[in-house]
């Protein structure tokens, strides 16, 4: 048959073959929701799935574009492959707008390859602003033989997200501490 052409705008055409994994956070959330419903767990669970289509079109984002988040914060796009953090930020804003009462909010994401570089493929990173919840999650992971490693929300790295054009950067400016700046975003 006729050979199809592929358009690849990533560093390596092989990396595109792994992009299905970018839906991992949503898959985890749906799996948890299904498990809780299956056992009739008496919890009030709200599931919010911010989703994106990454197809290329004339409306696609470009590096250095400034877009506005749901709460009208101007965001300068540092890398178009970092769309997940924009989605998560908008989902958190949605939670605030909806005045959803909750004991805590969990989000799951394949946010950066930087966490994988730091911790490898078998040890997920955990970020939290709640020390007690973080300890509980880490301890439960150890019990279930599914460990995680807590990384810091190191506030001084917030300055890497600042831009001179009154926008914040979606990716940070230094290229270091990338997993942390993604979580801070």
Name every feature range the model reports, one short phrase each.
Residues 3-6, 10-185:
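A generic structural signal for tightly packed, nonpolar segments enriched in small/aliphatic residues
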């Amino acid at each position: 048959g006729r050979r199809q052409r592929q358009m690849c705008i990533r560093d390596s055409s092989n990396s595109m073959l792994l992009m299905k994994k970018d839906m991992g956070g949503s898959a985890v959330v749906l799996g948890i929701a299904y498990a809780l419903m299956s056992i009739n767990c008496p919890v009030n669970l709200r599931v919010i799935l911010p989703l994106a289509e990454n197809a290329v079109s004339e409306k696609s984002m470009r590096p250095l574009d400034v877009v506005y988040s749901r709460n009208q914060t101007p965001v300068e796009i540092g890398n178009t492959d970092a769309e997940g953090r924009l989605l998560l930020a908008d989902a958190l804003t949605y939670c605030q707008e909806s005045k959803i009462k909750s004991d805590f909010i969990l989000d799951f994401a394949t946010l950066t390859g930087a966490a994988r570089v730091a911790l490898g493929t078998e040890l997920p990173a955990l970020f939290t602003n709640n020390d007690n919840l973080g300890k509980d999650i880490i301890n439960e992971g150890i019990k279930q033989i599914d460990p995680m490693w807590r990384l810091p929300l190191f506030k001084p790295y917030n300055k890497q997200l600042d831009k001179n054009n009154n926008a914040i950067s979606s990716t940070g400016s230094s290229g270091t501490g990338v997993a942390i700046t993604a979580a801070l975003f």
